Amino acid sequence: MASQNIQHFFHPDSGTISYVVADNDTKEAIIIDPVADYDVQRDVISYESAQEIIDHIKKHELHIVAILETHVHADHLSGSFYLSKTLNVPIYVSEGVKEVYSQWKDELCLSELYHFEHFLLENEHMDFGHSHLEVISTPGHTPSDLTFKIGDALFVGDSLFYHGTGRADFPGGSAEKMFESIRKLYELKDSTEVYLCHNYPESEDKLVYKTTIGEERHDNVFVDEETTQTQFVEKREGRDHQLPPPKLIKPALEYNLTAHHS
């Protein structure tokens, strides 16, 4: 059975966690949810965080074959475009990205949608080395949310947080769909490892980047194994009404959909 080395990278400014997943037999690897750095005051994009990933790749002599995004991020700028150009590898996103683009095109006066090399659908598969990745569609946070299953590891984007969930109030978001997506993940065995996209620790040494399906089924404050859809929707929508929009929502969506920054 194929095995993988999973290395996480934490971006404190946005609370985002990126991953490099390498097939141990062949050193072929993928990057999931990389981040670019954005100085709001100076309106400058830089790539120190992406360079950390490149340094890791070089140190371990990995061969990157793909960059994958779990969804269109609204709280940070993606490092995918920079890494794709630097490493000469394709970017894989959800087919739902097209819907997100349509919802925001006029409001944000967006230029053309970036020509992503691959638009992924439910149950698609890809291999890197001897490792096998399965695409699970998990809409709710946005229409574009995907979960990637590699062996007994899940990369869940913003569908699940540690003992919580992402918000569901963005255009095209749906608490009902999020509930259905999470329940689908809860059907997997309890020992399945869940690699998170966000965590907001007081300090980096308290970062939680991984949980399990069993732990979330028992301890998730928004949706445990006994929560009904009605209960979840009421709690999730109630919380979302209290939350302000992400500070970087406009520049993040523009950049992450078009690779342009105006």
What are these model-derived regions, one by one?
Residues 2-60, 147-156:
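Conserved beta-strand hairpin/beta-sheet module of binuclear metal-dependent hydrolase folds
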Residues 5-9, 20, 123-150:
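Core dinuclear metal-dependent hydrolase active-site scaffold
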Residues 14, 37-39, 72-77, 98-101, ...:
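Active-site environment of divalent metal-dependent phosphoester hydrolases
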Residues 32, 63-72, 92-94, 138-140, ...:
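Active-site neighborhood of phospho(di)ester-bond hydrolases with catalytic His/Asp-centered motifs
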Residues 36-130, 218-219, 224:
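Active-site HxH/HxHxD metal-binding segment of metal-dependent hydrolases
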Residues 143-188, 194:
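A contiguous binding-surface segment within folded domains or other stable secondary-structure elements
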